[in-house]
Design a protein with these regions (language model features):
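Structural/interface elements that position substrates and couple domains in central-metabolism enzymes
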Residues: 1-105
Length: 105
């Protein structure tokens, strides 16, 4: 049940501000109906980073902590990441050239 999901609150706010949202979540098929229609769902975390200006991590899936910052850097237009769950290794992402903002650090 995603009705009170903090991630959806952030996504809806970003859409209201004019952002184009590409999203990936390993459990998205179970909750597809709750996702705003403006959100483009991708097949993988790498796919949704192609051409992105900012990577925003809103959930704590283990898969996000395993992302290779160097691989993601080659896909994105700008190297900026906001990690709201602190699942990414800050040093690895900064070493790959990212401006990394963790929330709560």
């Amino acid at each position: 049940d995603l009705r009170e999901s903090p991630a959806l609150v952030v996504i809806k706010h970003l859409i209201d501000e004019g952002a184009k949202i590409q999203a990936w979540d390993p459990a998205i098929k179970e909750h597809h109906a709750a996702i705003p229609q403006q959100v483009e769902l991708g097949e993988s975390p790498i796919a949704v980073c192609r051409g992105a200006e900012v990577l925003v991590v809103l959930t704590e899936w283990d898969e996000f902590g395993l992302l290779d910052a160097e691989v993601i850097a080659r896909e994105m237009d700008r190297l900026a990441v906001v990690d709201t769950r602190n699942v990414l290794n800050r040093k690895d992402w900064q070493a790959a050239g990212f401006v990394h903002q963790g929330i709560g650090r």
